[in-house]
């Protein structure tokens, strides 16, 4: 319905890839209904991303006990389970709610690592969900200002040029 009204899609950072992937066909359907071209360049996909110069720092900041990503997803998972919506995080809808753990959610929803690894993960995301126009960096509270700032710089200056080279674009916003 949103596409038929002229709106462009944004897929949320807390969604499993299987849900993100389901957005494109619905967008196409809405566009076709009103004779509007469906352009993947208009699709924005948000992801929780953390980039660091070294893998150990990236892993600790993304997954560790004091991680802002852990805090964010802990809050979200707790609320979803409380209100009977844990299925949002289930790769298989037959899983029990107890099988939906915070560690599993972090593994499924957070892209982290060195610039090269994050580039590979973003390209794998595109392979999984399909072509999209813009990656939206879903920011979290910075538990460490320098690491948070450096993550954004590394993403812009190191990771995205690798991604853009691989997909054949030079658009800085992607």
Predicted regions and their residues:
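An alpha-helical appendage that flanks or caps ligand/catalytic pockets
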Residues: 18-129, 164-174
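Hydrophobic faces of well-ordered beta-strands that scaffold small-molecule active sites
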Residues: 7-12, 41-47, 133-137
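Short, solvent-exposed amphipathic alpha-helical segments in soluble enzyme
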Residues: 6, 64-67, 153
């Amino acid at each position: 319905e949103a596409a038929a009204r002229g709106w462009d899609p944004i897929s949320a950072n807390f969604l499993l890839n299987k849900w993100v992937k389901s957005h494109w066909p619905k967008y196409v359907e809405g566009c076709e209904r009103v004779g509007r071209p469906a352009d993947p360049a208009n699709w924005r996909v948000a992801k929780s991303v953390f980039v660091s110069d070294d893998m150990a720092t990236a892993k600790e900041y993304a997954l560790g006990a004091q991680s802002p990503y852990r805090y964010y997803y802990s809050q979200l998972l707790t609320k979803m389970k409380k209100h009977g919506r844990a299925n949002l995080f289930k790769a298989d809808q037959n899983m029990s709610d107890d099988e939906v753990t915070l560690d599993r959610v972090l593994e499924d929803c957070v892209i982290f690592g060195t610039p090269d690894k994050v580039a590979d993960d973003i390209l794998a995301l595109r392979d999984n969900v399909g072509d999209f126009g813009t990656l939206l960096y879903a920011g979290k509270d910075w538990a460490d200002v320098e690491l948070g700032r450096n993550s954004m710089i590394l993403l812009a200056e190191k990771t995205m040029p690798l991604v853009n080279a691989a997909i054949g674009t030079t658009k800085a916003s992607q």
